[in-house]
Amino acid sequence: MRHIISAPPHVDVSATVAELAKAQGLSVQSDPSRKICEAYGYQTIYEMPLELQKRARRQLIETHIEALQQRDQVVCDHSVFTWLADWMRWLWSETPAEEWEAVLDLSRPAIPLYGTIHHIADGKLAAYDGYRWLDRRNGVQIERLLRHLYTDFGCNERVVFSHT
């Protein structure tokens, strides 16, 4: 069974991930965002020039789907929903409708691979790691977008809502 964590970036999901992994004997798939940014020579995705940022975001989605296809007993500390919500929050005005539809189409294969989606709305503030945007107000906006994405992708019945 695949367990997917979907949470705003300011929320520390590590305890939930560890509990799920231990209780169900699952391996942990960590968010590849930092590695992908560093591979392009950047600390965060937000520093990248626009087109490179879009390419990196697509690469995150592709990498995530490939990892899911290789492992079925896993808990992921990330989801396509979080990346899509972040894209909507920060790049909406720079993404034409046709391009956004292509991004959604790229993301769609992840959804049937998801088992339980653990939506963590709020909780303990994540420690600064030099990568994530930890502003709570931004997190509230991302969290609202996550809920819309579950509906758009037709997977509300697999979402479990909780707090850390």
Predicted segments with their positions:
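Short glycine-/acidic-enriched loop or helix-start segments at secondary-structure transitions
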Residues: A15, A85-W87, Y128-G130
